[in-house]
Amino acid sequence: MGNKGNNIKKPGVKTLSIHHGETFSEETGCVMPPIFSTSTFKHGNKQNFDYTRSGNPNFKILENILRSIEDSKYCTVFGSGISAVTAITSTLKSGDKILCESNLYGCTVRMFDKVFKKFGIEALYTDFTDKKSIKKIKDFQPTLIWL
C-alpha cells in the first residue's frame, strides 16, 4: 500500500534549513552552493546582482530558506545590522515615534538620535522590564516598537 499523500508531514524547520531549494550544480557537481566572496558582479548578469551589499547568490539562497521556514511570500536579508536598521526606520515618516528598549546597540541609538531625529522621528528609550514604564509606554503611542 502506497502513501496517497494525505499523511505526508510538512517538513520542519531543521529540514527546511538544510534542504530547501537544494540543487546541485551540473557544472561542478557540488551539492551545497559555494560561498561567494566577491563584492562586485558583471553588469547585466542574469541574476541582476551588482554589488554584494544589495544582494548576491548567498543572500538569495538565505532569503529563500528563511521565506520557506516562515512560510512567507517575501524575505530580505541585509549586509549589516545598521543597513537593516536604516531600511526599517526609513519606512517611518515625520511625526512617527519609536519606542525602544533602553539597552540598545550604540550605533542604533546614534542613528535614531542624530539621523532620524532630523526627519522628525522621535525615539523614547525605556526599560521594558520595569512595570513603572507601562504608563510612559501607553502615553507615548509609538508607531514602531524596537526590541
Located regions from the model:
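Conserved N-terminal alpha-helix of the aminotransferase class I/II PLP-enzyme fold
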Residues: I35, T40-T86, S90-T91, C107-F116
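Well-ordered alpha/beta subsegment
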Residues: D71-S72, S83, K97, K131-K135
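Active-site phosphate-binding strand-loop segment of PLP-dependent enzymes
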Residues: F128-L147
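Conserved PLP-anchoring active-site segment centered on the Schiff-base-forming lysine
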Residues: T91-T108, T126-D127
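A glycine-rich helix N-cap at a beta->alpha junction
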Residues: V115, F119-D130
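Short conserved active-site loop signatures built around small residues
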Residues: G2-I35
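Short, surface-exposed connector motifs at secondary-structure boundaries
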Residues: I69-S72, K93-I98, K117, F140-I145
